[in-house]
Design a protein with these regions (language model features):
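Outer-membrane pore/translocation modules
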Residues: 23-26, 77-223, 248-252, 256-264
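Bacterial N-terminal signal peptides
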Residues: 6-15
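Bacterial N-terminal signal peptides that target proteins for export
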Residues: 1-5
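Generic detector of solvent-exposed, compositionally biased contiguous segments
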Residues: 49-69, 110-112, 260-274
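Residue-level signature of outer-membrane beta-barrel architecture
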Residues: 72-76, 120-124, 178-186, 226-230, ...
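Residue-level detector of the transmembrane beta-barrel scaffold of outer-membrane proteins
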Residues: 41-43, 80-86, 131-135, 190-194, ...
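Short glycine/proline- and aromatic-enriched beta-strand/turn motifs that initiate or cap beta-hairpins
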Residues: 20-102
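Outer membrane beta-barrel transmembrane domains
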Residues: 208-309
């Protein structure tokens, strides 16, 4: 890990007063690594409130969050074996980030995260169509930071480069999730109810300058989806359903700290096309969704596409 925030502190100390230099946190590098791991943990944790392939754009105040995720899970055999995978890209841009590193000075950081997470679990039936699914997860990712400190580029005073001082961090995560869900039919309505608790612990890979930095992703997800057949609407001559969904993600610990919010809620609508008549192997339906996003510090939207197997 290149000492992103430590470089920032050094640059500021070289260009401002000795009093300001004394306010620099000497553990800035470890703090930067923990911040980077916290941001990466959000991207690497599967979010069931969004579609399998989704684009999210949210902003508020001095923060912006953009992410793309490709997520899916299925049972390859007739038994309870369940496999899950996620590939995600996220860009998070807060201002006044970890202000204790340089007291009274704004730090504008753009964190770009790429993550891949896999999961292996087993599905057990409960009662009344409810099922429980414990899953073990392994994740790999990289987060890169570009920063602007006190309205000027993070550039050493004697450097001939015109690039921002930036840095990257490779990390791995390991953890587990427990999901409880139900799929049922109520009259013409098909409904899904899902509860999921996910915990992943992230640590840097071969980054001695990161010190003892680590971060955890601890998220609780509540989600529901309702489908209603549109008998008089056919797209591409295929049966169509109206889809309504809503969910909330509750963030705990490091995830809540780095996002500065304890929750993120979504609600949306869309159309689902029955694809069983097309001959596509294993695919039962395709779904297009538009969701609104709201949180304490954010608001925005998400566009997603999903498949039902």
């Amino acid at each position: 890990l290149r000492r992103i925030l430590a470089f920032a502190a050094l640059s500021a100390a070289n260009t401002t007063s000795p009093t300001f230099a004394q306010s620099i946190n000497p553990d800035a590098s470890e703090a930067a690594a923990q911040a980077a791991l916290s941001v990466l943990s959000i991207a690497a944790t599967p979010n069931e409130t969004l579609s399998s392939f989704s684009f999210l754009d949210a902003s508020g105040g001095t923060k912006s969050l953009r992410s793309t995720q490709l997520r899916g899970g299925y049972k390859p055999f007739e038994n309870g074996l369940y496999l899950e995978g996620l590939v995600a890209y996220q860009k998070y841009n807060p201002v006044i980030f970890f202000p204790g590193i340089a007291t009274g000075t704004e730090l504008d950081v753009t964190w770009s995260s790429v993550a891949a997470t896999v999961g292996v679990g087993w599905e057990f039936p409960l009662i009344n169509e409810w099922k429980i699914r414990p899953v073990g997860h392994l994740s790999l990712g990289q987060v890169t930071a570009d920063a602007i400190f006190a309205d000027f580029r993070l550039l050493g005073p004697r450097s001939n480069s015109n690039e921002l001082i930036d840095g990257n961090l490779n990390a791995f995560g390991i953890g587990a999730s427990l999901g409880i869900f139900r799929e049922a039919q109520f009259g013409p309505w098909q409904v899904e109810y899902r509860f999921r608790q996910t915990f992943l612990e992230f640590n840097p890979i071969n980054e001695p300058q990161a010190g003892n930095a680590s971060a955890s992703s601890n998220q609780t997800t509540l989600f529901s989806r309702h489908r209603y057949p549109l008998d008089n609407v056919r797209l591409f001559e295929l049966p169509t359903q109206l889809v309504l969904d809503a969910g909330v993600v509750l963030y705990h610990g490091d995830s809540a700290t780095v996002l500065d919010t304890d929750w993120l809620a979504t609600a949306g609508f869309g159309l689902e096309i029955d694809t069983r008549l097309t001959g596509l192997p294993a695919v039962r339906a395709g779904r297009l969704m538009l969701n609104g996003i709201v949180a304490e510090e954010f608001s925005g939207f998400s566009i997603g596409f999903g498949l039902r197997f």
